[in-house]
Amino acid sequence: MPPDPRLEAAVDKILDRTGEEILSGLGESRKEAAEALAGSAKTLEREYDRIVEEGRKEADKIHRKIVGSADLEARNKQILLLETAIDRVLEKVLASISAERGPGYPDMIKSLIGEATATLGTTQVVVRAGSRDKDVVQASLGGFPGAELAQEPIECLGGVKVSSKDGSMTLDNTIDARFDRMKPLIRKEIVSKFGIGI
């Protein structure tokens, strides 16, 4: 069935209208994510320091081996080991984040839904959440007329996935997706602390 030109025009109009809002929302989301992470900073800071120390030891070991070897193949293997160590660090950080369900978590869920509805340009949405978050999400939907909670839970550490009711647009605002979007920046920061170029 050929695409409906009216639907395409409507989607284009929505995308044009909300372009700046999306960019602004992304900036706000980044700020909110930073604030949410700062809220659990003490716990995460201790874990972060321990993980960074483990990573530093692993990176120092890798760095000494790279400096001692002129063989490019050996260096590439060492970089692969560093990537593995970084992946372990990221997994531990993600596990720490997923375990957090502090008093600010319901506000974060409401903010994620608000960001998604603003980005999609409608509150007529279907919100999907993990089984752990269904009650929190359901309680947050009162502020979004026309929004409804999907019955089937999704596999995620937290957050929400929001779709327009017709399914044409979706915003993945799960902790998993947000973390995946931040991984390259986190990876770059960790690598730069050890002075190893990848």
Curated annotation (Swiss-Prot):
<keyword id="KW-0066">ATP synthesis</keyword>
<dbReference type="GO" id="GO:0033178">
    <property type="term" value="C:proton-transporting two-sector ATPase complex, catalytic domain"/>
</dbReference>
<keyword id="KW-0472">Membrane</keyword>
<comment type="function">
    <text>Component of the A-type ATP synthase that produces ATP from ADP in the presence of a proton gradient across the membrane.</text>
</comment>
<keyword id="KW-1003">Cell membrane</keyword>
<dbReference type="GO" id="GO:0046933">
    <property type="term" value="F:proton-transporting ATP synthase activity, rotational mechanism"/>
</dbReference>
<dbReference type="GO" id="GO:0042777">
    <property type="term" value="P:proton motive force-driven plasma membrane ATP synthesis"/>
</dbReference>
<protein>
    <recommendedName>
        <fullName>A-type ATP synthase subunit E</fullName>
    </recommendedName>
</protein>
<keyword id="KW-0813">Transport</keyword>
<comment type="similarity">
    <text>Belongs to the V-ATPase E subunit family.</text>
</comment>
<dbReference type="GO" id="GO:0005886">
    <property type="term" value="C:plasma membrane"/>
</dbReference>
<dbReference type="Pfam" id="PF01991">
    <property type="entry name" value="vATP-synt_E"/>
</dbReference>
<dbReference type="GO" id="GO:0005524">
    <property type="term" value="F:ATP binding"/>
</dbReference>
<keyword id="KW-0375">Hydrogen ion transport</keyword>
<dbReference type="InterPro" id="IPR038495">
    <property type="entry name" value="ATPase_E_C"/>
</dbReference>
<dbReference type="GO" id="GO:0046961">
    <property type="term" value="F:proton-transporting ATPase activity, rotational mechanism"/>
</dbReference>
<keyword id="KW-0406">Ion transport</keyword>
<dbReference type="InterPro" id="IPR002842">
    <property type="entry name" value="ATPase_V1_Esu"/>
</dbReference>
<comment type="subunit">
    <text>Has multiple subunits with at least A(3), B(3), C, D, E, F, H, I and proteolipid K(x).</text>
</comment>
